[in-house]
Structures are given as structure tokens and as C-alpha cells.
Amino acid sequence: MGNLLKVLTREIENYPHFFLDFENAQPTEGEREIWNQISAVLQDSESILTDLQAYKGAGPEIRDAIQNPNDIQLQEKAWNAVCPLVVRLKRFYEFSIRLEKALQSLLESLTCPPYTPTQHLEREQALAKEFAEILHFTLRFDELKMRNPAIQNDFSYYRRTISRNRINNMHLDIENEVNNEMANRMSLFYAEATPMLKTLSNATMHFVSENKTLPIENTTDCLSTMTSVCKVMLETPEYRSRFTSEETLMFCMRVMVGVIILYDHVHPVGAFCKTSKIDMKGCIKVLKEQAPDSVEGLLNALRFTTKHLNDESTSKQIRAMLQ
């Protein structure tokens, strides 16, 4: 326990090295049941990202159909291009629901009495690693989604075509797979700039409101502690040297940023105010010490997807660091 506290307070000279082992943490017997549940969800995350990365959209077909409204062949070509894409978008959306449930199970484990969030993170490293993997996935998904306007365009065209055909009393086979209620929910999901982050934020707020006997600090302290551990691992040569690849370094930075953003959305006054338990200046400094091309996306995530950066309570110095 003392080791992790020393990590958090930077007393790092004379103690057995401790760090959150993002590469090798294995579940204890006490963690195994929840770990298995979360693992079953996370095993699909890479295929979701690969599928999203390969998503090219039906832009040319839609454009041709809109420019030639009386050409039935072009209308059919656009529709046949869009339908399989909508089925893929449904898969992404359904994964977000599974992720939401997974996060709530993790939060329950990592915040429950009698242990403090810090004690939980030290005792349950495999669950902390899964929490980190959820955040890592979330930032990667949202980065890819933000760079792909085809998703919104395809889905809008799909909704318009369905509505037009309803007026003409036509029922299309795809409505058996993506009915009106599902389409409405998907529409709200994809309308968000960062849909997976919004999902995690909602899941965390829902967890807090459902567990009224649990102080909100238990949840926000879990997040701020995770941020501190990531920051100290990144800025301490002894810890960095234990990462076996650049990929783990990037993973750690992405997780740190993901937790900051989540904290900023969940905490009543956010991550940037003076009373915040997150050392924002230190976190930004750590990012800026890396190769610019590797962290620009993460700095942009702090600039554009946090909630409280532009509040009056945010210091000018922090704002200037993110200019």
C-alpha cells in the first residue's frame, strides 16, 4: 500500500518499485469472475476498431443517387451500398451497450468499501488493466469516428430513405434488423462527436446515481488515482524503462488522457479547477515532452472533448499550455 502512495506523492527514491502493470497483470481468484466478464467484452474490441478503420462509406453511390433522383438503378445501387454499412454501424452501437455494462461492473469492484480507490488499484491490478483497456479502446474508437464523416452521411441517407419508403407504405427487409427504435438510438449515438466517451460518461453517472450510499468521491478518486499513477509512470525513468515497447508507453498516455476526460465529465467541477485532484499541469507537461506527432491527437482530445477547460475557474496557465 505504501508503495503506491509513494508513487502518488513522488517519494520514489528508496522503496520497492511498484507500478500498474499494464502488460502482465493477471487476475487473482477474487478478481477472476468480474475479469472473465469484462474479458469476454474486450476480446471483440480489436475487431471493432479494425472494422471501423476499414469503413469507407457509400459517398459516391449516395451522391449519384441524390443527383439523379429519377434513376431507379442508381437509387438501388446506393441503397444496396448503404444497407450492409448500417448493419456494421449497428454492431458498433451494440458493442457500446456491452461496454457500458462492463464499465459499471468494474466501477462496482474498484470503488466498493472497505478499501479506498488507491487500495483497490493496487490490490486488483488485472481489473485496473481492464479499466485502462476500456479507456484506450474508447479514445481510439472516437478518434477514428471523428475522422470519418461518411458514418453520419451514410446513416442520414439511410434514415431519409426509410422515411420516404414508409410514406409509400414500403417495408424494407433491413427494418427487421434495424427497426425504427434501434435507428433512433443509433442516431443519437452517432450524433455525438465522441460517442464512446459519452457512453462511458453516462455509464459512470448512472453508476453514481444508482449507488446513492457510495460517495461520488469514491468514483472520482478512482479516476484521479488512475491518472496520477499513469503520469508518474510516464515521468519516472525507472518505470518507463520497464515498459517493453513504445506501444505500452502510448497506451499509458492514452489511458491517462481518457481518465482525465472522463473525470472532467463526471466530477461536478471537473478536472481543471484548483481543487481538482488531478495535476493537470503535470499531465500536460508529460504529454508535451513526447514526440509531437505521437501526442497531437491526445492534446486535441483534451482541447476539444473535455467539459470544463473553458470555465472561468480554469487557470490561464493551463489554457495557455493547451493553446
Swiss-Prot record:
Keywords: Lipoprotein, Membrane
GO biological process: regulation of actin filament polymerization
Subcellular location: Membrane
Location (main, coarse): membrane
GO terms, molecular function: small GTPase binding
Keyword Lipoprotein (UniProt): yes
GO CC terms: membrane
Keyword Electron transport: no
TM region positions: none
Residue runs in coiled coils: none
Alphabetized InterPro entries for the sequence: CYRI (IPR039789), CYRIA/CYRIB_Rac1-bd (IPR009828)
Pfam families: CYRIA-B_Rac1-bd
Membrane topology of this protein: Lipid-anchor
Subunit structure as annotated in this protein's UniProt entry: Interacts with RAC1 (GTP-bound form preferentially).
Physiological role: May negatively regulate RAC1 signaling and RAC1-driven cytoskeletal remodeling. May regulate chemotaxis, cell migration and epithelial polarization by controlling the polarity, plasticity, duration and extent of protrusions.
Family, as annotated: Belongs to the CYRI family.
Protein name per its UniProtKB record: CYFIP-related Rac1 interactor A
Organism in which the protein naturally occurs: Mus musculus (Mouse)
Chain's gene name: Cyria
